[in-house]
Design a protein with these regions (language model features):
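Structural motif
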Residues: 53, 62, 131, 140-142, ...
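Conserved mid-domain beta->alpha element of the FAD-binding
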Residues: 82-83, 110, 137, 172, ...
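Conserved N-terminal helical subregion
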Residues: 1-96, 100-113, 157-160, 167-170
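Conserved FAD/dinucleotide-binding core of flavoprotein oxidoreductases
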Residues: 16-30, 34-39, 74, 116-196
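A secondary-structure boundary/capping signal
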Residues: 34, 52, 152, 216-219
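Conserved beta-strand termini and adjacent loop/short-helix elements that scaffold enzyme active sites
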Residues: 7-9, 53-55, 71, 130, ...
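Short secondary-structure boundary/capping segments
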Residues: 42, 73, 99-102, 126-127, ...
Length: 236
């Protein structure tokens, strides 16, 4: 992409644009792709190093050494431990007593893939801003497929927050999509691989007592998405 174009959902008018090609160099350029494809690229030379289907059951800190004990009784010792397993970090819970759980941010994320559209500049990133609803559309391959990510304000009671199967329920999904601004219904009618999930955020920062243990990403602190921040982070 050469630009990020900002639009108003209510008026469909363009607000402004940011020419990101100004930040490109010959060997380092802005690009957009699916997160899953990025993960495949990053791990392609690490297949023999990454342990699949391993779950940590205990973290033992002894002086400057850290021992990991897995549920299959395997052990591993390291000098430094980087924890990056998301907002509901199991690893963080193993080293932190009385952990404050993340809170629901009264926000839902909607994600999927849509086909090429005459109404969208398919070469660039399009960011649409509206009251209680933002969404971003950007190209992910040379075939014209577009990634769609939206952030919507939506209240869930405590039972609904815990009910993971709710987000696969056809009636619930329809209820969510019916609240989407009418200006973008056309995109949702063509969306594939639709996923809807609640957004949880952190209440406080946590610093480990051991300087050899480092928390990063949402495991360290999950920020609330605002002004499509969550969608923008997905682009990055």
């Amino acid at each position: 992409p050469d630009k990020i174009n900002f639009y108003s959902i209510e008026s469909s008018n363009k607000i402004c644009d940011l020419n990101i090609s100004d930040y490109n160099s010959e060997d380092c350029k802005y690009t957009t792709l699916k997160r899953s494809e990025l993960v495949k690229f990053l791990k392609k030379d690490l297949e023999n190093v990454i342990k699949i289907n391993h779950s940590i059951s205990k973290i033992v800190q002894q002086n400057q050494k850290i021992q990991l004990i897995f549920e299959n009784n395997e052990t591993s010792e390291c000098d430094h431990l980087i924890i990056s397993d998301g907002v509901f970090s199991k690893s963080k819970s193993l080293i932190l007593e009385n952990q404050t759980p993340p809170r629901y941010n009264k926000t839902l994320a909607i994600r999927g893939t849509i086909p090429i559209s005459q109404k969208i500049n398919c070469r660039n990133i399009s960011l649409f801003l509206g009251p209680d609803f933002h969404y971003v559309i950007y190209p992910v391959n040379q075939n014209g497929d577009l990634n769609f990510i939206a952030i919507m304000k939506y209240k869930l009671n405590k039972e609904e927050q815990k009910n993971h199967s709710l987000f696969n329920d056809a009636n619930f999904i329809k209820r969510i999509l019916d609240k989407v601004p009418i200006e973008m219904r056309e995109f949702l009618n063509q969306i594939k691989k639709l996923k809807i999930f609640p957004v949880f955020v952190s209440k406080s920062f946590f610093k480990t007592k051991n300087n050899n243990i480092h928390l990063i990403g949402d495991a360290f602190f999950a920020f609330p998405p605002s002004f499509a921040q969550g969608a923008s982070q997905s682009i990055e």
